[in-house]
Amino acid sequence: MPSSQRWNTMSSDRLFVYGTLMRGFDHPMARLLAGHAEFLGEATCRGRLVLVKHYPGLLHSEAPTDLVHGELFRLSVPEELLRELDMYEACGEGFPEPTEYLRQLVDVTRADGATEKAWTYVYNWPVTGLPRIESGRFLEH
């Protein structure tokens, strides 16, 4: 079961992004991430993507063929950056429940096959009627 979004010193300084926070997006939060995190490479996590308006939502999946493609970063100041990203994603303490996203630790696989834990934002609202991004790649939708 994924870990909750509460920060502690035993948590990961890794962040897996799969949508508008990826490199190349001209978005203020993508620029913040690019300026305060080290790009570690492309990565995948088990899950499915749905299109929510103009942005994606990641859903958990146990099926080995369900992969979401994205990018892995090492955060320079994890606690501060995650707080900023939580505000952007409107999740965590102080936001009405249920929040649209939950920040959770997931297993990600790097291009070299190594796996590690990373934070990501998992979609938390009903998905009825939302189109699935079959490729698992937001940029290909």
Question: What are these regions, as identified by a protein language model?
Answer:
Residues 2-141:
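Glycine-aromatic micro-motifs
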